[in-house]
Amino acid sequence: MTQHFKTFGVIGAGAWGTAIAQMLAREGQTVHLWALEPEVAAAINTARENTAFLKGVPLKPEIRATNKLEDLGLADAIFAVAPAQHTRTTLRALRASLRPGTPVVLCSKGIELATGEFMTQVLKDELPEAIPAVMSGPSFAIDVAKGLPTAVTLAIEDTRLGTELIQAISTPTFRPYLGTDLLGAEVGGSVKNVLAIACGIALGKGLGRSAHAALIARGYAEMTRLALTLGAEAETLTGLSGLGDLVLTCSSETSRNMSLGLALGKGETLASILAARNAVTEGVATAPVLRRLARSQGIEMPICEAVAAVIEGEITVDDAITALLMRPVKAEAVKP
């Protein structure tokens, strides 16, 4: 373990933020975990469990929950795990206490609805002196929290610093792989949530596993097309933060996005599904802004377009399926 990283801060005490804190604490480092809700911080500090968002997982004593973002300011690295639509607010609140040159690892997978910006741009807007990094890949919170084998991509431009950070956070069951394509990792993590909703809808409607597989494959083409147009590297999309995360999220009901799509396919309304949840489903906010981004770039993303139209209440699930099935036959192209 490198001596450079001894203390970590984690913004967001939902399931994923708590799981990351648990992973970081396994090697004995001190982890300051910021929770929005005072009762969540209290439960973590007293009962050593996040009963609201990650019930049943005993948390390491090295995790210190707090409601004060300034408590994270002296950490050697920050992991930003607040929902994508709240990332800007939390980063802005950290501005006064963060040391210049601190790595901020972005773990939220989404695009800001108000601006159309990915999280790295949001970070540059709010904390220009921070060093941006992105951690993304096929990883369910419960698996990471329980110490089950998981591999992710950690993308950062400074490979020396990235290597030090990976050495500090790697465990026998949590393996980050170093990359430098932050944009590619962000595109993969954002688009796969929307595609998972589509896959859930297909299974909820009983369209079968063949249709499910086709959605994953054609969805991957949409993801890659967007990434290449925006300037990302094709290789990134073949890795953990692209194809790996896509396959996991589109294939398991543990995924919030997949399960939301499944419920939509079975006839539940979006409002009723969201009302019954205490956790954010990132694909719901990402779908409309992803559609705007694709149109602004002149990119065809019919699956993501269909999901956005359903989410916005413009068409029914049945109409979306019909529209996709009626698309003209064409070559199986991936490149824009």
UniProtKB/Swiss-Prot annotation:
Pathway(s) the chain acts in: Membrane lipid metabolism; glycerophospholipid metabolism
Residues reported to bind NADPH: W16, K109, A141, R256, V280, E282
GO biological process entries: carbohydrate metabolic process; glycerol-3-phosphate biosynthetic process; glycerol-3-phosphate catabolic process; glycerophospholipid metabolic process; phospholipid biosynthetic process
Compartmental location: Cytoplasm
EC primary class: oxidoreductase
Residues that, per the record, bind sn-glycerol 3-phosphate: K109, G137, S139, K192, D245, S255, R256, N257
Highest taxon of the lineage: Bacteria
One function term, GO molecular function aspect: glycerol-3-phosphate dehydrogenase [NAD(P)+] activity
Pfam families referenced in this protein's UniProt entry, alphabetically: NAD_Gly3P_dh_C (PF07479), NAD_Gly3P_dh_N (PF01210)
Catalytic function, reaction form: sn-glycerol 3-phosphate + NAD(+) = dihydroxyacetone phosphate + NADH + H(+); sn-glycerol 3-phosphate + NADP(+) = dihydroxyacetone phosphate + NADPH + H(+)
EC number(s) on file: 1.1.1.94
Keywords, alphabetical: Cytoplasm, Lipid biosynthesis, Lipid metabolism, NAD, NADP, Nucleotide-binding, Oxidoreductase, Phospholipid biosynthesis, Phospholipid metabolism
Active site: K192 (proton acceptor)
Family, as annotated: Belongs to the NAD-dependent glycerol-3-phosphate dehydrogenase family.
Function: Catalyzes the reduction of the glycolytic intermediate dihydroxyacetone phosphate (DHAP) to sn-glycerol 3-phosphate (G3P), the key precursor for phospholipid synthesis.
Record protein name field: Glycerol-3-phosphate dehydrogenase [NAD(P)+]
